[in-house]
Regions:
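Internal helix-turn-beta structural module
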Residues: 289-352
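Active-site bordering "gate/hinge" segments
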Residues: 1-231, 256, 261, 328-352
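Dual-mode signal for accessory low-complexity, basic/Gly-rich regions
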Residues: 221, 237-307
Length: 352
């Protein structure tokens, strides 16, 4: 059941996304969506005078050998032309699907119609109480994105042993502020991170997942180190003697057996977090079913390494790991943007 404290927070955010009286708003959900999230979104949009209607689709059967979690690639729309027509002609789509439309194959069709899409992360509404609006977050994300888009090389190191090189030529970059930016735009809430989807053959080195880093598919903090050796974009070795390494190997191998290739082992995207209100330690305070993990992707000073699908590299797979890491140093063309897990204030005031 929705509560007033959540409705007010959602309404404030929808105002930032430009929702005003009379605009057509679709609240998109599926049969497995979180009911209190859907209700809160609907009531907030109605409060602002939106012409609101619900569009509910069935959650499809999972055709994979393992459970799918936290991918950002909802399969709920199933290419249904009537559903796509309704979404594309709306002013604002409030995406309350379980996985979200961010990487869904139908997203481009919806955005081409001019709709704005706000992907509301599948968190318990209580979580949004902590995602306070920072007036400067949009500026800082834009500045960080400009630096990332101009850079030729990203290098990531850590005291734990990470030493990763990503050549950025041909990469597609993006920044998320959490706020839609006009017709045909998408944002996910909470926001506050920048990402690069590398071109093929550009990622190599070593990633060491240290205790306290997070595997968001499992909603689990790493307890023992796991070392990933990466060559030609793909994980070639998973080293570690604890259950974290065993889980990592087991989950990815399931996709390789079904899909017949190693796309699940490949690099999906890399980036860093800028959201000062997001926290890395919040997982301990919620049941796994109450969260999706977007907050962990965005906490300030994090480095995010992700495996799985990458359209830029021509790779498609249902297997996906988002791996937010602490205490990393991230450089772009030799200039630090994150030092040992802390955001670096740029001397030219381009990023803080």
């Amino acid at each position: 059941m929705a509560e007033w404290r959540w409705i007010r927070i959602f309404a404030d955010h929808l105002e930032r996304c430009g929702l005003g009286a009379g605009e057509v708003v679709v609240v998109l959900s599926e049969s497995s969506s979180r009911p209190e999230l859907v209700e809160t979104a609907r009531l907030a949009a109605e409060m602002l005078g939106g012409r609101v209607f619900d569009l509910v689709v069935p959650t499809p059967v999972n055709d994979q050998p393992v459970a799918i979690r936290s991918t950002g690639a909802s399969r709920a729309l199933q290419g249904n032309p009537a559903v796509l027509a309704a979404l594309a002609t709306a002013g604002l789509v409030l995406d309350c699907t379980v996985e979200g439309l961010l990487h869904a194959p139908e997203l481009r069709t919806i955005l081409r119609g001019g709709a704005r899409v706000l992907m509301i992360s599948n968190e318990h509404p209580e979580s949004f109480e902590r995602f306070r609006f920072s007036p400067d977050l949009g500026m800082r994300v834009a500045q960080a994105h400009r630096r990332l888009a101009r850079a030729g090389c990203m290098r990531v190191t850590s005291a734990a042993g990470t030493d990763l090189t990503v050549r950025l030529a041909g990469a597609v970059t993006a920044g998320s502020t959490g706020v839609t930016s006009g017709a045909g735009s998408i944002a996910h809430w909470p926001g506050g991170l920048v990402l690069a989807f590398p071109a093929p053959g550009t990622v190599e080195g070593t990633v060491v997942l240290a205790p306290g880093d997070i595997n968001l598919t499992f909603k689990r903090y790493m307890e023992r180190p796991v070392t990933l050796t990466i060559a030609d974009d793909h994980i070639t070795e998973i080293a570690g003697d604890g259950v974290d390494a065993d889980l990592f190997r087991s989950y990815l191998s399931a996709f390789a057996q079904v899909e017949g290739d190693r796309s699940a082992y490949a690099c999906s995207h890399v980036g860093w977090g800028l959201n000062e209100h997001a926290r890395w330690d919040y997982l301990e305070l919620y049941d796994k079913g109450a969260i999706n993990g977007t907050e962990a992707r965005a906490f300030a000073g994090s480095f995010l390494y992700s495996t799985g699908a990458n359209e830029v590299a021509g790779r498609f797979t249902a297997g996906h790991f988002d791996l937010p890491m602490r205490s990393c140093t991230v450089t772009l063309d030799g200039r630090e943007v994150v030092e040992a897990g802390q955001l670096v204030v740029d001397p030219d005031s381009e990023i803080s």
